[in-house]
Amino acid sequence: MQVSVRDNNVDQALRALKKKLQREGVFREMKLKQHFEKPSEKKAREKAEAIRRARKLARKKAQREGLL
């Protein structure tokens, strides 16, 4: 990953780098890789995430259609 530093503004470059890493999911992946996750736990986590995403999508769709 590459970030350009303009006008010796390192703070701004660091913020841009953090934002890029966050978007790519690097921090989340690092957190998950810190400890071994059993396959059954991984499956349960992924299923819960999918349910969460579906609920969020349904909520947004209902709000767009004016139901909420």
Swiss-Prot record:
InterPro entries according to UniProt = Ribosomal_bS21, Ribosomal_bS21_CS, Ribosomal_bS21_sf
Instruction: Enumerate the UniProt keywords alphabetically.
Output: Ribonucleoprotein, Ribosomal protein
Cysteine pairs forming cystine bridges in this chain are: none
Q: One GO cellular component from the entry?
A: ribosome
One GO BP annotation of this record? translation
GO terms of molecular function? structural constituent of ribosome
Query: Organism's domain of life?
Result: Bacteria
Q: What Pfam families does the entry give?
A: Ribosomal_S21
Q: Which PANTHER family match?
A: MITOCHONDRIAL 28S RIBOSOMAL PROTEIN S21, SMALL RIBOSOMAL SUBUNIT PROTEIN BS21M
Q: Which family does it belong to?
A: Belongs to the bacterial ribosomal protein bS21 family.
Recorded protein name is Small ribosomal subunit protein bS21
